[in-house]
Amino acid sequence: VNPTSRQRFLDTLQFKPVAKPWARWGAFLWDETAERWKQEGWDGTPLDDYFELDRLVRVDPWYGPVPEFEHEVIAEDEETVTYVNHEGIVMREFKKNRDTSMPQFVKFPVANEAEFEKFAAERLALHADRRLSAAWRSMVASGRVQAAVGKGELRAEEQAAARGAAPGEQWPRKCWADRWGGFFGSLRNMLGVENLCVAFYDQPRLIERMMEERADRLIEITAEVLQHTRFEVFWFWEDMAYKGGPLVGPALFRKFAFRHYERVCGWLRHQGIQHIGLDSDGDIRTLIPLWLEAGIDHLWPFEVQSGMDVVAVRKEYGHRLGIVGGIDKRVLSGGGEAMRKEVDRVMPLVEQGGYIPELDHSVPPDVSWKNFCDYIAYLKFRLNRG
């Protein structure tokens, strides 16, 4: 009997040999990329079905503000619009090319302890019936949840996409506390990045309280998820680095965050969740020891343009760290020999185990449908999955 996708996924993270390497098409597309590909020949079939690859099914509810903030336009001119988003942040955005330009963050919902306690009481309580909505429950019960589950109700086309082909296959499942499951990223959503970085020095009590609240909620919300479904892997979300390194020094971050990571990881393991991952963009090298020690065993996406090199990271950490990602998305715009060399570069890690080869984040719109198909074909060829 051939092992299921779920079993191959677990074997991979446990550095056990797998006859058929576990691989998915990637994680995300920019909206403009999807539009471009549809013009160039993609019929919209979910990519894991189209390319006959594995999938990591998401079963997470929304870990952020409930009720969500109402979308409220505060000001607009010919080129920009200023509004309150679903997380309570006042944003100013270009009307055109929203996805390809950075918004301006005008104001954040929290500035001090009193505002945080009010925000937490009004927006961050469990509200199990709203977080784990009827739509979420029925999707999970049918084993079909896959698209971005978190926010609100699933759209019809996402439900269709989540059904997928290969009806007998058992996919691995992931509960990803996206945007609100961590001890830097979620605080940044409330305070803003500059205010947060300064608060580590000026408002340590506020930081301590916010981290404690997040750890409490991560455990409380995830306990509810486990009433409805099992999953193989839990992911934190941090996005706390750029190409120059982390946005807060590793020693300072450890002082505040370590015990909260350790507590959540300990609780997860006690529930039988064997694998705990974390998503952070940027150059996270100096944070890896802290995360490993706290109980996190794999990371994503290892952005090449930020100096992350999965070959070097593997040399340093060996079997202690599972790696997901690390293929430079930038080589796909040109494709050809540069793309093949980049895929070749990471293949030794596939042999060693504990590695899932995929792009180091969302596929940008400068990648043609043909180049993406070429990339997947070559990846499958190198993995003997052609």
List PLM regions with ranges.
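Active-site loop segments of alpha/beta catalytic cores
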Residues: 1-33, 82-84, 111-386
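Generic structural signal for well-ordered secondary structure
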Residues: 2, 40, 74-76
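Short, solvent-exposed loop/edge-beta patches enriched in aromatic
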Residues: 17, 52-56, 75-77, 86
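Compositionally biased, intrinsically disordered/low-complexity regions enriched for serine, proline
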Residues: 18, 43, 58, 62-64, ...
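Acidic/polar N-terminal loop/beta-strand segments that form early-domain functional surfaces
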Residues: 26-28, 61-62, 84-86, 96
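Segments that shape or occlude catalytic/ligand-binding pockets
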Residues: 30-71
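A contiguous, low-structure linker/loop signature
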Residues: 73-125
